[in-house]
Amino acid sequence: MIEQLRKERVRQTRGSQRKLYWKVPGSVWGMDICEIRMVNLPGKQFILCVADLASGYKFAPMVTTTEPCGPQVSAHLEKLFEQFGRPLFLKRDNGGNLNHGAIADLLSHNHILPLNSPCYYAPYNGAIERGQGEIKWKLRREYGDVRTFGEFARSTGLVVHDLNHHPRRKLDGSTSCIRFFNGPRVNYSKRKRKEVMLWISDQAFDIVEKASGDMKPDAAYRIACQIWLVKNDHLSVSKLGEVLPHLSGKTAHN
């Protein structure tokens, strides 16, 4: 038991020292669901946030009074794919509604690779969670007096629009909207997507074999995805300000 706790702490420490920098708009999206209580509204309100990680561009959110179920999330994603194109990867947490069979079918049909957070390190999806924090803070600050769900839904849309047009230091003073729509975006064909999937699958298998039983398949898959992203210049990983070279299967655990 003590050894398990020690390994858990080491994993968390390694993750907290790493910073991921997403380079290519359109290649990796993230999604998560957050909840918020408003003073004049009963119960909780739920917001499904989906964003492009490289640009920070937040797509139109789905707002509900109950936590969205898998088919609802899938339907919302499908609309976004039709409107904005398909990412190559979709980052998400491990909640059942974000890992529902309907979503798995949608991703498979569109040849999109799921990329789940490690169970031991929730901040792996930190970019999308920071975006949620911005939305909630701005909602409470500027629209805290809304009295109907309709007003809340409209206010959430306005907040997302404002954030997409806010200059960002990490974008060199540009906005998420400009970076997503005006910059080069990934647009992989079905054939290329299949090639990427096969490469990652083979790499993950090799990682498991080399680990001699000390590596779970989902961790190996996550490592293989990260290796591909770094090698193809979609992602850079820094550790305490130092940019790391291409990751090997034995060092990239997040």
Set out the residue ranges of the language-model regions.
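Mobile-element integrase/transposase regions
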Residues: 2-49, 57, 69-76, 83, ...
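Short, conserved catalytic/metal-binding motifs centered on acidic residues
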Residues: 32, 56, 90-93, 125, ...
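Hydrophobic alpha-helical segments, especially N-terminal targeting/anchoring helices
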Residues: 51-52, 122
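A short acidic/small-residue loop/turn micro-motif
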Residues: 53, 64-68
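Short small-residue beta-strand/loop micro-motif enriched in glycine and branched aliphatics
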Residues: 56-61, 115-117
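Distinct, well-ordered alpha-helical segments
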Residues: 77-78, 103-104
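Acidic/histidine-rich, metal-coordinating catalytic segments
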Residues: 82-100, 118-120
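Charged alpha-helix within mobile-element recombinases
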Residues: 104-253
